Amino acid sequence: MASIISGTAAAEGLLADLTRDVARFSQVHGYAPTLVAVLVGDDPASHIYVRKKIEQCRKVGMESVEHRLPADCSEEDLLALIASLNADERVHGILVQLPLPAQIDSGKVLDTIDPRKDVDGFHPVNVFRLSTGTGGLVPCTPMGCMILLRSVLPDLKGKQAVVIGKSNIVGKPVAMLLLEQGCTVTVCGRHTRNLAEVCRNADIIVAAAGTPHLVKGYWVKAGAVVIDVGINRIALDDGRSRIVGDVASDEIGHAAAFTPVPGGVGPMTIACLAAEYVQAARRRAWCWRRTNRHSFSLEGEGYGALLSGAKLGAVG
């Protein structure tokens, strides 16, 4: 029977470490790490996402500020706000909630954010650093995927990994992180020929295609680890709906372990976003040191230990 990798338990462990580190940071420097979230327009889903991110940051002791701009905000006004936040030494992380209104070039906006404050990891500088293994801020969902994966496979060297999904937000960054950890990586899309056969040879499958139940049980070999990033709402016969992943999880009991949906990668995403805020603040304060690539601990414990699979306690 496959083990369930609990993102909820892993997120709780990460947030506990963050709370202690934020308290130490605040004691040493006399101020808490500060996040500024920028929200343009009145999209209900965006408001919910921003509220959750701010609540999580405040929960661990960080300062969080929200800038709300009208839906008819000009690109020039938004860029001017970002420029002012870039110059403000009291601001350690900047998050611009996507999507943006049609009159605003999202790429131009993201490129304007100071890469040292780009907690989403979308700036070209951070993308380059990730691709070359030279550090930089890592997108939060891929980071969460790696923490959960390392909880059951501490040593990834030599593993065959398949990533289904080519997005700049999840698929490509996850592939880069897997490569850096020594995996042989195949990146696929929903329309890749012989996708089932490709997956059957994989030790690790990361499903991030946005297609409900794309990965069937016969695609997964015995003993594989499956990370399900998909969040899809499907209609039920009684008129209600439910959230499902990209993997038919009821068919993969022969896998070694998998992340459930909900309760898997989702809870880790916001927790890892908070970790990026803290890392950005440390860099600005010149008080952090890296214990290994993509490690987030001052003392060699905490987030670095989570990433390496130690003391996670996430498998049930």
UniProtKB/Swiss-Prot annotation:
Its EC number is 1.5.1.5, 3.5.4.9. It holds the Pfam family THF_DHG_CYH. The keyword Oxidoreductase applies. GO terms for biological process: L-histidine biosynthetic process; methionine biosynthetic process; purine nucleotide biosynthetic process; tetrahydrofolate interconversion. InterPro entries: Aminoacid_DH-like_N_sf (IPR046346), NAD(P)-bd_dom_sf (IPR036291), THF_DH/CycHdrlase (IPR000672), THF_DH/CycHdrlase_cat_dom (IPR020630), THF_DH/CycHdrlase_CS (IPR020867), THF_DH/CycHdrlase_NAD-bd_dom (IPR020631). GO terms for cellular component: cytosol. It catalyses: (6R)-5,10-methylene-5,6,7,8-tetrahydrofolate + NADP(+) = (6R)-5,10-methenyltetrahydrofolate + NADPH; (6R)-5,10-methenyltetrahydrofolate + H2O = (6R)-10-formyltetrahydrofolate + H(+). NADP(+) binds at residues 165-167, 231. CDD domains: NAD_bind_m-THF_DH_Cyclohyd. Keywords: Amino-acid biosynthesis, Histidine biosynthesis, Hydrolase, Methionine biosynthesis, Multifunctional enzyme, NADP, One-carbon metabolism, Oxidoreductase, Purine biosynthesis. The keyword Hydrolase applies. It comes from the Bacteria. Pathway: One-carbon metabolism; tetrahydrofolate interconversion. GO terms for molecular function: methenyltetrahydrofolate cyclohydrolase activity; methylenetetrahydrofolate dehydrogenase (NADP+) activity. PROSITE patterns: THF_DHG_CYH_1, THF_DHG_CYH_2. Homodimer. Catalyzes the oxidation of 5,10-methylenetetrahydrofolate to 5,10-methenyltetrahydrofolate and then the hydrolysis of 5,10-methenyltetrahydrofolate to 10-formyltetrahydrofolate. Belongs to the tetrahydrofolate dehydrogenase/cyclohydrolase family. This is Bifunctional protein FolD. The lineage of its organism: Bacteria, Pseudomonadati, Pseudomonadota, Alphaproteobacteria, Sphingomonadales.
